[in-house]
């Protein structure tokens, strides 16, 4: 089943069996995902019926210092990681389009369910990814890629199933929302708040997709 953004991930395992997770990308988002998987381990186990075990983290540069992270988990071979037998769920937070597309397709075709926060990837290749998920029986979760990860896709599908939505109005990019709100409330200028958004990790090192509207589109 693909594009499943309404149900909790079901790994299809018996009660108490562990769920193997692979994380692709260890920037601001990936690092936070890894932290939360450890900090909220008991909550996740209670929700899915078994413990979560991080099996590996794929990065572009293995030589970069990563304090507090087991070096045995780090790999620069994302393709081998997502195809491992002990990996059930892949979390993609790499960014970009072409490379993550190839890795996510490899994961889905190997029967691994995927969670992605990559809105550019979903916008450009969502249909292809959904087809791959359908073919293998894997799940593709993309709620994290929509409207700054607020839970909106599931409610729109369920609660408004009988309605016709003519348009949606709002500032749907989190970085832009932060910048505009701060400019309005503090009187700071745009460049100052863009720099602050980057420092806080809200904006990427290259914020073009955020501030020029590509992510929102």
What does each model-identified segment do?
Residues 74-76, 83, 91-92, 115-117, ...:
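General beta-strand structural signal in soluble alpha/beta enzymes
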Residues 94-110, 117-158:
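Rossmann-fold NAD(P)-binding glycine/threonine-rich loop
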Residues 64-65, 122, 178:
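Short, active-site-adjacent cap segments at secondary-structure transitions
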């Amino acid at each position: 089943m693909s594009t499943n953004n309404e149900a909790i991930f079901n790994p299809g395992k018996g009660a108490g069996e562990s769920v193997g997770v692979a994380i692709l990308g260890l920037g601001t988002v990936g690092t936070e995902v890894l932290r939360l998987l450890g900090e909220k381990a008991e909550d996740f186990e209670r929700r899915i019926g078994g413990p979560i075990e991080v099996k590996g983290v794929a990065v572009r540069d293995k030589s970069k210092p990563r304090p507090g992270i087991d070096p045995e988990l780090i790999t620069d071979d994302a393709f081998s990681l997502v195809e491992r037998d002990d990996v059930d769920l892949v979390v993609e937070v790499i960014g970009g389009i072409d490379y993550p597309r190839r890795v996510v397709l490899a994961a889905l075709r190997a029967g691994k369910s995927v969670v992605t926060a990559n809105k550019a990837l979903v916008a450009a290749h969502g249909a292809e990814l959904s087809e791959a998920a359908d073919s293998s029986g894997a799940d593709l979760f993309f709620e994290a890629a929509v409207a700054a990860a607020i839970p909106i896709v599931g409610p729109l599908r369920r609660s408004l199933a009988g309605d016709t939505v003519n348009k949606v109005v709002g500032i749907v990019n989190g970085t832009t929302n932060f910048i505009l709100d701060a400019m309005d409330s503090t009187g700071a200028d745009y460049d100052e708040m863009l720099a602050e958004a980057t420092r806080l990790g809200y904006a990427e090192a290259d914020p073009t997709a955020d501030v020029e509207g590509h992510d929102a589109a």
